[in-house]
Regions:
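Long, hydrophobic N-terminal alpha-helical segment
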Residues: 2-52, 57
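Short amphipathic beta-strand starts and helix->beta connectors
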Residues: 1-4, 80-84
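Vicinal oxygen chelate
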Residues: 2-7, 14-22, 64-71, 88-105, 107-174
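Ordered, amphipathic secondary-structure segments that act as subunit-interaction surfaces
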Residues: 70-78
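A cross-kingdom feature marking solvent-exposed beta-strand/loop segments within repeated
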Residues: 44-60, 81-96, 126-146, 170-173
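Extended intrinsically disordered, low-complexity coil regions enriched in Ser, Thr, Gly, Ala
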Residues: 25-46, 90-94, 102-127, 172
Length: 174
């Protein structure tokens, strides 16, 4: 399928580059000792119920980040489950898997991209903060990050990731 002539979608600032790795400890050591990157902050994410290639999926992912100026390097190791990262690792090996940009009005951007034949292959939401602030007062909203990975087979294989931070209402269990 040939790409349709796109109507240009304006992205925000570049956030980071994502590099898929097989062994996080070796990768952190390598990027730190060879290139002087770091310190790396590492977290494990339990990703539950996200959209992946038209299905609902779950995965466990370890990510390590280190800033280089205003942009960060993200190392990604999938511990369990199938994601765009495991797909990349299986088909291409370790390496640069995505370039991420911050956007506003993500859903509008996705509609515009769809007109150009560019579709999301993975979409997930990650809660960022606790509904209670430091004083223990309940909040009515919380910050949420939505990440969308766009199909890149037609444009060389490096995915574009769109990221939107949004305040969302907190729902309390009844």
């Amino acid at each position: 399928m040939q790409l349709k002539r796109p109507s240009m979608v304006t992205l925000g600032k570049m956030s980071h580059v994502g590099i898929v790795v097989r062994d996080m400890d070796k990768a952190v050591e390598y990027y730190g000792s060879v290139f002087g990157l770091g310190p790396f902050t590492t977290e494990v994410y339990d990703l539950k119920s996200f959209a992946y290639r038209g299905k609902t999926a779950s995965a466990r992912v370890k990510a390590a980040i280190a800033y280089s100026g205003p942009v960060f390097i993200e190392l990604v190791q999938v511990l369990e489950g199938e994601t765009v990262h495991t797909e990349f690792l299986r088909e291409r090996g370790e390496g640069l898997q995505h370039v991420a940009f911050l956007v506003r009005n993500l859903d509008e951007k996705l509609k515009e991209l769809a007109k150009s034949g560019v579709e999301p292959v993975m979409r997930l939401r990650i809660p960022i903060d606790n509904p209670a602030d430091q004083a223990g007062t309940a909040k009515k909203t919380r910050l949420e990050l939505t990440e969308v990975y766009l199909d890149s087979d037609k444009i060389g294989g490096t995915m574009i990731q769109l990221m939107e931070f949004k305040e969302v209402p907190v729902t309390c269990p009844e």
